[in-house]
């Protein structure tokens, strides 16, 4: 097996039994692919910007004399790169330029004669670009656009579950949902009449829409009903017989066939009777005339002579009507075939309640419903109806919608127009009637075949189209104004509405979210999130249980575990590991093909719709050596149900056992032993883990850690293989392998590392190289670790030695007892970086000034500021310290005589400005790590800004010079090799200046050309360097683009080191969370017989009721893994021979069942083995994949190999008394995370502060510097104790008795501790509210 550079250094023992048929796909592809589709030119014009332009252009003037056509578009280069955008607080975007063609037609000449054509490139605003990690930088902050799960366009049939009508009758409905345009609903009422609604407005009889489509009553009936023919023969009334139609009816007369009575009067017609009639081949039977009474005529019958209407279509026949038909000479007439069972008379009944009789009346009725109060004209009514469903500008089903529509109506062809047709509407009504008749089923709305994913690209395209449509209206008006000869396309188009629409979407849409950047996992998960909320989606209040529930089609598509707790449960989901979207936006999951019981390696992606057709076995089905399915009956899934089938019936099989879960859930070892509720908490809490100071890989992992670390983009991955040429803390240089070089390039890759930057959640982002000079790396290898990664693996927490035992009540109710040593070793210390900004504005009274000259502030407070009034980098500051001195001019006030005197003596300055400096918020302490000053163009830069500018220039020059030197050395190295090969000596070359080498001649012509090419490269490199430096210099020197009225912004970055302390929240990966109750001295902790104390003590009662047994297995396996590491450590200390080490390692990696993944130590070189052994001293990392993990006997075997008790329990001693505890205790290693719920951020106490305006009560919460709520139950407590005075002051002077509290304050100042309670303000509010209801309340004093 080939290992990557970092894998080889620390090989993880894998307990998985199944081979990986499919590698874990790139985890961010849903974001990147979608946006790529939006941005890249699409010649077909089906999606992206191209589609948006083509749908709006060409724009024709109202008169038709001019037309604006779209030719093509191009995106320019972004001005600033991603990092610069983040620092400057601007959007990372590229300008969009569109080539438009304006065509003017000659009005006088024949139609279509072109008078003039003008072409021009027009600027259409900025389009935000996606970074390579799938995020957007909007106004300097990283944001993620979450994908949306919405109802797919198409046609859906449903019923109301009997909730609408009091009788509990089930009412069916059909709904045609377009991608954009009006919704069309058909629904039955309790009397079985069919109605139509447009856009959920007032309902109309469904026949109205058919009349508006120009159907007559006859045509409507012919479309929806079969007919029965009656014929008058020799004075008898004969009926055409279709025997099947009589099923279930009660004969009202004798049914006679070939002279024999088959069914007697009053008997029910059964299947036997029908068979008899079919056998006798009877085509007509005689019926009494009364049988026809009440039947409904299928056609209009007009008198051949007089032309008057004898019977109209849909008229119920009477004896008289039948007689009239005979008289008029109609020997044969047809009636509608209906029955109660499966041929209801719905459409016929609906026609009866329909008041309209012509197309015009129907159109007017629809117009009145859509535009109540407007007088309808024929043109307006026709135009409105045409625009509703038949105009491609107003209505679009989209390709997805058309595909779903045609599939649901069982059509062969899946393509068609985006608008509706007559047939579409009629067929929907027919299908709805079929469902009402019991011949078809309703749809399942929550089936993933009926819900699709709308990703970034598609949503951005829709927003862009909205902007274009706004522009279209303006352009049409301008084209009609005349004088077009002088206008150019640029004069017609205003880019504002377009950029406003795009900006609004990226900046403030519900689905554009501030990226969760706690750790790499939270980034990846956020980008893979699927939300049912948002514009065009559901709302929290409306969503019921069904939508939130796990559906069988979620299998392998959406994770059944990872979803938030609380009001959003089930509405926000996460993509499963292997899931992807297909061209229509439906989720697909991969399956291996099974042919005649033999599993192949062929993988097919199936959507939820396709999956229903197949029989699918699970990934852990037993197989033979040659890949056949072993068992007689195999558990499998078919049509959303679990069943057992024979091997030859199985068509597909899961790709991997991890297929059903998301990335976060796949990181939980022994997930299969955890209760789902706890697993949900576990996967959610991993996203809140704060990156620790030194990342520590999990001893017990799942093998998924590497994929997350690499795909998240926090690590640095080598793009091409080569040798490490240079490495330091801030850059890595790789000399690329010869075979990966592009022709004519220097062959040097330079990777700059991110150092100590702030993340969205104020955690620290820092990259550290994990390679050594001169080592070879391959493409795709991790060369530098980021936050929460360790040797290219995700490392969210720390491996701590845990004991499950009670300890003096300090672990009551999930509290956690922690060893002091964990604090000393900085195991759970985290770094947080806060950004504080000071803005200097231009006020009415004059500009605010940033200065060190602040009125009424002592020297001590200014000691950390430089002469510009800005804090030094490296200063240690605490709450209340001034970071940036700033003074604001204040208005002239009336002065007292004393002040006038003081001003006369001491001059003007101090009085006309007030101190508005930026201070460190209360409770914050830390070190200033960076200061940035942004100055508006045209405002003179202060000394500090110039210093920073000089420093940046210096650094940029140094970086570029080093980069240039490295590349130049590469070029000279290649030319040197060429010249040495051509026979020049080392000495001669060394004597010459290196630039002169290019002037030497080589006899071999090909080599000479190569040398000349290298010389050209050198010249290009030099020019490139100068250009880059000039660009950099221009960017650094130019003024900043600040908001209107802002002169200067100073940003100060504080780094805070937070050690673990009581009150911090910690958690394992199994939903086992708790708060630290005490940091216990090392000597008091329970320890083993060798005197090694445990790091952390957990409560054993937290396990049984929560049913997350995975944590116990993790602890046992962790103990074994650590034991192996300690055994290796002992071998190193005993200086055992290398071959012994190899043998032991081989024994460890071979342990387990025969299917377990093998590692061949023999393949590794001696150096590799030494590195590996050195890294394994701290413990052997193991992987136990989800649903395919280590078995109990394997854990025991590993414990045995590590010379540890197989029970995983040891005797512990009490650190305080030295006595052994009565029972053995489960001790082992658990991976514990420190969550971003730190007590420092929550601690808060109010002294005096602001009050709410209406109730005059103190505000609540830390952000408002609020008080603690003294609630209902607290009042009861004081009442119960009879503490009347305490209660009185709580409800008055300490809360909202305005006069009382001011008096109280005054009294305390005077040293008089009395209180005079008055009327609480909230009581006055109550009085006012009662009065507002019209009830007068007066307070009478006794």
From Swiss-Prot:
One GO biological-process annotation of the entry reads: DNA-templated transcription
**Top EC class, one word:** transferase
NCBIfam families xref list: PRK00405.1, rpoB
**Which branch of life, at top level?**
Bacteria
Q: What is this protein called?
A: DNA-directed RNA polymerase subunit beta
Q: Extract the PANTHER family matched here.
A: DNA-DIRECTED RNA POLYMERASE I SUBUNIT 2
Family of this protein: Belongs to the RNA polymerase beta chain family.
Indicate the quaternary assembly: The RNAP catalytic core consists of 2 alpha, 1 beta, 1 beta' and 1 omega subunit. When a sigma factor is associated with the core the holoenzyme is formed, which can initiate transcription.
What this chain does, per the entry, is described as:
DNA-dependent RNA polymerase catalyzes the transcription of DNA into RNA using the four ribonucleoside triphosphates as substrates.
